[in-house]
Amino acid sequence: VSPSSDNEGAKFQVHNQSQVIEVLGTEFNLKAYNNDDNVFTTLVEGKIAINLNNSEKVDLLPDQQVEWNPNTNTLSVKKDVNVYNEISWKYGVFNFNGKPLKEIMKTISRWYDVEIIFLDKKIEETEFVGVIRKNRNLEDILINIKNFGVIKDYERKEKTVILK
């Protein structure tokens, strides 16, 4: 979402499930996928107010993130979040800083429209640090992850990637 200065300071609301984000002159990132348990709202600059089910209201300041689970209606606020990690996609890269392979592969799966299967469940929690350009082909990314020793091997079958 662009800064409000680009829109003459006009405030607006973003509705997501039972969450309402009131934009009060700001730039923020909302990560809300249907198949994810949690919704993440990260403030880059300005200020936002998040209302949950018209009951609880949370004000967010820059470098803060709200993690909300709509199933349990639990909410937590994280301070001093590395905002670049959350918005790097806007700059054509995925920035994986200490993320578990399971989470990384979920992002890769969405971007390249493939199903990812882990044959060895132990590697799902293996942490990876790296930056991957979004315009790279999937084969190059898989080769790099293999060369870093994160996975032993992989196999591609049409729209499925099997990690070994």
Can you say where each PLM-predicted feature lies in the sequence?
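A residue-level detector for the "anchor" residue at the start of short, highly conserved motifs
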Residues: 1-164
